[in-house]
Regions:
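Helix-adjacent hinge/juxtasegments
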Residues: 70-93
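A glycine-rich, hydrophobic loop/mini-helix early in the fold
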Residues: 40-74
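Generic structural signal for hydrophobic core residues of well-folded globular domains
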Residues: 27-32, 51-55, 101, 147-150, ...
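Long, hydrophobic N-terminal alpha-helical segment
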Residues: 3-52
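Glycine-rich, aromatic-bearing surface loops/beta-hairpins
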Residues: 125-164
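Minor-groove-contacting beta-hairpin "wing" of winged helix-turn-helix DNA-binding domains
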Residues: 113-119
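Short, extreme N-terminal leader segments that mark the start of a protein/domain
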Residues: 1-19, 149-164
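Basic amphipathic alpha-helical segments that dock to polyanions
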Residues: 96-108
Length: 164
C-alpha cells in the first residue's frame, strides 16, 4: 500500500479508507438484512469496490434485484474479466478500508469470517442531497442485497471467474 504522501489527490479521495469502508458497510448492512443463509462473507467484500468504483461496472448494474447475478453476468460476459481484474487491483484498498472499519468497531467479523455491523454506531450526517456519494451509498445497499440472493461465495466467485 502506498504511503499517503505518495498518493495523488484523486487517488486519496477516491480510495479514502473511510469512504471505501462506508461503501462496504452499506453493502454488509443490506446483505445481512436480506440474507436467509447467513451473514456477509468476508471474501465478498472484495467485490464491492470494483462494482461501485469502476464506471463501466457501476453503470451496467441492473436497476432492480429481479435481474439475478447469473443472468446479469450472461448478458455482460465481456465484463467478467473486468470484475476479477478490478477485485485484484483494488484488494489493498479493500483491506485498508476493512482494517479501519474493523479497528473502529464499525464492522465486526465472526469465527465464520462473516461481517456484521459493529458495536459502535457512528453518527452520520449525510447531507449530500442527491450527490454522487449518496447515489453510491444507495447502490452499495443494492449491491449487498443483490449479492445476498446470488448464492454462496464459492458460487459467486466461480461465476465471476475468481479462484480462491
Amino acid at each position: 500500500m502506498k504511503p499517503w504522501n505518495n498518493r495523488s489527490d484523486i487517488e486519496a479521495a477516491l480510495f479514502n479508507p473511510a469512504y471505501c469502508g462506508e461503501l462496504i458497510l452499506h453493502a454488509v448492512k443490506a446483505y445481512n438484512r436480506n440474507s436467509t443463509h447467513g451473514k456477509f462473507p468476508y471474501a465478498l467484500s472484495y467485490l464491492i469496490l470494483p462494482f461501485l468504483l469502476n464506471t463501466e461496472l457501476y453503470e451496467s448494474l441492473p436497476a432492480t434485484k429481479r435481474t439475478k447475478l447469473i443472468t446479469w453476468l450472461y448478458g455482460n460476459r465481456f465484463l467478467t474479466p473486468t470484475i476479477a481484474d478490478k477485485a485484484k487491483s483494488l484488494k489493498e484498498y479493500t483491506n485498508e478500508a476493512l482494517l479501519l472499519y474493523l479497528s473502529m468497531e464499525l464492522l465486526r467479523i465472526n469465527d465464520l469470517t462473516e461481517l456484521d455491523l459493529g458495536s459502535v454506531k457512528m453518527v452520520r450526517k449525510h447531507n449530500f442531497q442527491r450527490s454522487e456519494v449518496e447515489e453510491k451509498l444507495k447502490r452499495a445497499e443494492f449491491l449487498g442485497s443483490w449479492l445476498s440472493e446470488a448464492g454462496d461465495i464459492v458460487t459467486i466467485y466461480s461465476l465471476i471467474g475468481i479462484t480462491i
